[in-house]
Amino acid sequence: MNPNTTAQSSSPFMLELTGKPFAFQGYVHGFHQPTLRYKLHHAVVNPPNLSDIDAFFLKELGVYSDFDHSGDEDAPLLVRLKNWPSALLNQANHPVFEPARISKFEGKNPNHYLIFQPCMDHDAALSSVVFVIRLLKLAFQENAVEGLMEVKKSFSSFQKNLAFTGLQGFNQKYILKAASELGIQWFRLKYTVFQLGAGCNARWLESTFTDATPVISSTLVRHKPSAAHILHISGLPVAKHFLVRNKDEAVRQAEELGYPVVIKPADLDGGRGVKTNLRTAESVSRAFLAVSKFSQQVLVEKHVPGRDYRIQVVNGEVLGILEKVPGGVIGNGKDSVQILLERQNQERETAENDLDYPLQKMAFDEEAKELLFDQHLDSDSVPADGQRVRLRGACNIASGGVPISVPLHQVHPDNISLALRAARVLRLDVAGIDLLIPDIEHSWLEIGASICEVNAKPQMVRSLYKPLLATMFKGGNGRIPVVIIVEAEFTTENISFSIQRECLAKGINTGLVSGKEVWTGKECVNKVCSGPFDGARMLSLDTSVEAMILHVTDSQVMRKGWPVEWCDVLLVGRGPQDLQNSAYSPIEWLSFAETICPQHVIMEEAEQEVYNHATSLFNSQKLLSAPCWAGNEERTATVMTAVNVVAGQKKSPATQGSF
């Protein structure tokens, strides 16, 4: 790095966090996930050239930002603060699906900015922001090299700390991304479990485990001999196998089965420890010792020739089929196997195949050497142009394989039926059926096949996550009708109870949050609720709730964010009870409410300025005005308008029940 290009100016500068960052647990400003808001003092004269810092971020730290860096050449530091924390979070499996947003203070503090950073974990988001500020400050140092090297040394520890609270695997990240794109609300329940949707239409997921996945079934399929037994007595094809306790027993059973054989852990999935196509007693002994390091339960299985396919089944429907090509390299007629593998591993650090599936690197290990020997090759051999050299016995993607999509119309119907039956007899709502068959275009009844594994929590390619959710939510978005009332009064005679009574009369089990009370139908289930946000979460978790009424009587939602992303009817009265003592004006409340896109807005008579602001936010088709809500015809009309919207939404296909 050339330090002279980094510090172009010795002019004073300021790049500091000011005040206390604010954690929104709910939804604000149109974001589809929690948000960290922080205030930044940014005053820079003649900003330095950041090309070296950019290169360091990408090449030395290996962090790629897919958000746009252009568009604000006058404030390059802000552009990076808008994008780089999100890149760090995504790298650590903290999903961020949209860039941060920046707004500038007007008036007394022209160099102060508010930045809204979307996140999953607020502490992780703040750590990423602080890290980026530290890195950007180095651009102003006369000799930044030493500082950058210190950053690089500490980066591994920083990454581990971020990853500790991140998601495991990649299923969950892309499920949440698909949910956001489909308009399905999500929030984190605990650790790796998320809720999608609300009330009676909500679903829980942990990766591709769902709230409908039976514990018995998932336990059975995790133990391969048990799953194979169930499949066998159901008339489905599986390979003959034996559990073995030592290498001598492994050799004896292999000889009884007849070579070649496969040795694998009986209680692990994902292709871990699998040794395939073993043809000698010596190779079986070595394989047993290797596999026993992964598990004390070792399985010897008859090798079944054929191509390896993963058939994805969700709720009795095949969503997609992949052929799993075993890991290897393709020759170019110039380079050795060793060089080809090194180059491929380097490319796979960030590469994904055309199915957007993360590709895994491969080590040049004993398995690779043995397979090369079987192909009459070694690490120095130069394969011909286009020649495929196999370096892995198992076809699993996790061990370096490559998935290739197979169009459903090319698959014989008998093979589709086979996969559906396998998932059905094992009682699995979501399943990955691994099928070995010579040609999937021909019936397994004619050419033979074997189900080698069933996975109750299968990894999927990105193209399947939206179909997965569409199937789970039956084409809907998991929402229930929501009425939000912004009004100080919260007696039992207020309008929220009137709306609830009418909804109940129509057979809609309606939840209500009003003051400190939470109701599900006619039952008060909580009298010490701290506010509408917490009350709404209670109702969202209750699968009996078919519609929700939130009576906002204080400014808790301004502090925590909205508990829902949508609103069917917004009723705006005199504002929350603490409005007079808060920093929030009626106009700010309207702007805050506009971010949840209410479909119908009913306003009590307001000052002209407030009403004019409402008309600028909500189009004339959405906005209605009622002179008064208490004791007159307008109150009744207001109540029935809200009730009719709720009843109409309840019948809408988008909000039909998920189960």
PLM feature segments, named:
Residues 116-256, 269, 491:
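Conserved N-proximal alpha/beta basic substrate-recognition cap immediately N-terminal to
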Residues 204-362, 413, 447:
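Active-site nucleotide/adenylate-binding loops and adjacent lid/helix of ATP-dependent enzymes
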Residues 340-402:
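Extended, charge-rich helix/loop segments that form flexible
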Residues 482-502:
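Glycine-rich phosphate-binding P-loop
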Residues 501-595, 599-616, 621-648:
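ATP-dependent carboxylate-amine ligase catalytic core
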Residues 649-658:
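Positively charged N-terminal leader segments that act as targeting/secretion signals
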